[in-house]
Amino acid sequence: PSPAGQIGMARPATAQERAVVDELVRAAEAVRQLKLRRPVMIEIEDGEAIAESLRSQIEEADIERARSIYGTLGLLDAEDDLHAMFAGVLGEQVIGYYDPETGRLVIREDVMSGLTGALGSEQTQEARLVLVHEIVHALQDQRLSLGESYQKERTSDADNAFRAVVEGDATLAMLAHALRQQGIPLSAATEGIQQLGNHLDLNGLVQGEKLDDAPTIVRVTLIAPYLRGLQFIAAVQGRGGWPAVNNAHRRPPLSSEQVLHPDKYFTREPSEAIVVQDSPQVLAAGFKRVAEDTLGELELGVYLGQLTLSGAADQAASGWAGDQLVIYARNQETAAVWWTSWDTDRDAEEAFNAARSVSPNAPTAMVERKGRSVLIVRGLPAKLHRPVRNEFSKFARAIEGQPAPPEIPPSPVY
């Protein structure tokens, strides 16, 4: 049973409540052009039980990984209670959610009361739209193997891209349902959605004071799957209808770059696979490699944009071609060695300038550019910079003679 079930706060839907949800299921199926294979189990929980369910899904290993990576990069305060922060953000006033692990659609008690009571209020309409979004997740699970897809190991970059498909699909379907109720076809709106995505009001899905107060890296990675994902899926759907969206689940974008620039998804522009080589001197000094990741264009934009008003430097990150970040630890110290590559020397220069502007004024930090590659180092004793620079230089020279990954002609089917 779910954690909420264990504390006795969950109950099955009544026949009347089931009828209300069934109506929303039919709406989701119609707009998304998919049908459920079997009825979705519905449970009603109060707000505190839902918050507790979501809090219980936070893995301690994920918290420590976030602390290790983003703390070392200066994007999170390593002293913060990250568990409390994530729990607060995730537990804020959730209308309902679909759990692919258990196949349950969980709806908040007071929301359900509103849906079966006086209809027509603004909150009730918002709740209906959000539940259509969640029912689309059930369709994804039953028809497009969402549950299996969630289990795959991915880099942060690939995970941001995967979640953009999942949430962008459900958000576009939700908007399509809202438009349909006003007699407006989705085709009339997909281009506008791509252009206005950042200004759309998605309050029912992503909102809350705790989210507003969260560090930029947390806020961006939680909101981007909805907003950037919506823009991406609008481009895919506008090009090939809902069958193309189904295909995006089967062949998801490989990077956040492909989400942020859908043309790069359509041409399947590959990123550069980068493997940071350990410097023997760093290991001999007692540092151990404890984490590695590819953060991609989305998260590099946050890193490079720490001094900007928005907190993200989309322009500086837009020439991204590949990256790998390695975190080293020695006792209580952590250090970051980050190799990045860019489409052109000019893109690398722009990234280099942005990286230098946010680099700590400390002897343990360094930023260097060679051709279209940029090295970022944080937290590493200055005497170890030269061997790290030497390893990076070999990599930079190796790709110097190579152009960035070529674009591949678009496939006619997506």
PLM features: residue spans?
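Short pre-active-site segment immediately N-terminal to the catalytic Zn-binding motif
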Residues: 109-132, 155-162
